[in-house]
């Protein structure tokens, strides 16, 4: 049991450290002459409309009622943490990667989809979001070489701020849908972290450094 508790504490310590790192990087980016580009992966904590575009599920009021005053695809009544990052960086809110209607990808892109998991048990798990990122980067480079100027270039991908906020749904599924013991749930955490590690390694392989 002590080992299980220490593993769970270690998991949340990693999440805290990553959050602090993102905050630090976002402050530096706001002072830089180069406009910060933000690329996000995750679940409902940072989904700005991915599940709406991807599934067609109607997500209307009361979602969005206190700030946007309309449904935006966010599963909440106002802004998300990623929205506050965008405001701090003086940039528009991130467009979902899956949104085909007038998206704006010049300052970033959001691959997050509500319900997403670190492990491959959902239609848009982290591994799929990473593959979408690879396609997005390759396609952006193709279009830029053809004359497009409204997309992220190679230098932009290199210097972009990358965020990954995922894992809560894995724990919820394990705790409430699988009838696992607490110890068994905690034992799944290293596998979840391995998926996040692979995602970070792929982002690095394709030029991401922050």
Summary of predicted features, one role per range:
Residues 2-210:
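Conserved active-site regions of diverse hydrolases
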């Amino acid at each position: 049991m002590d080992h299980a508790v220490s593993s769970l504490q270690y998991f949340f310590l990693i999440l805290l450290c990553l959050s602090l790192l993102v905050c630090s990087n976002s402050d530096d980016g706001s002072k830089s002459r180069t406009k910060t580009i933000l690329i996000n992966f995750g679940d409902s904590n940072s989904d700005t409309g991915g599940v709406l575009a991807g599934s067609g599920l109607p997500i209307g009021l009361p979602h969005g009622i206190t700030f946007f005053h309309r449904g935006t695809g966010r599963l909440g009544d106002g802004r998300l943490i990623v929205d506050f990052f965008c405001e701090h960086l003086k940039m528009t809110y991130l467009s979902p990667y899956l949104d085909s209607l007038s998206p704006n990808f010049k300052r970033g892109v959001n691959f997050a989809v509500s319900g997403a998991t670190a492990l491959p048990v959902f239609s848009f798990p982290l591994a799929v979001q990473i593959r979408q990122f690879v396609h997005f980067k390759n396609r952006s480079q193709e279009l830029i070489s053809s004359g497009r100027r409204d997309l992220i270039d190679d230098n932009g991908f290199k210097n972009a701020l990358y965020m990954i906020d995922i894992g809560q749904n894995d724990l919820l599924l394990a705790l409430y849908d699988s009838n696992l013991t607490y110890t068994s749930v905690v034992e799944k955490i290293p596998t979840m972290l391995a998926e996040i590690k692979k995602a970070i390694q792929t982002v690095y392989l394709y030029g991401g450094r922050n």
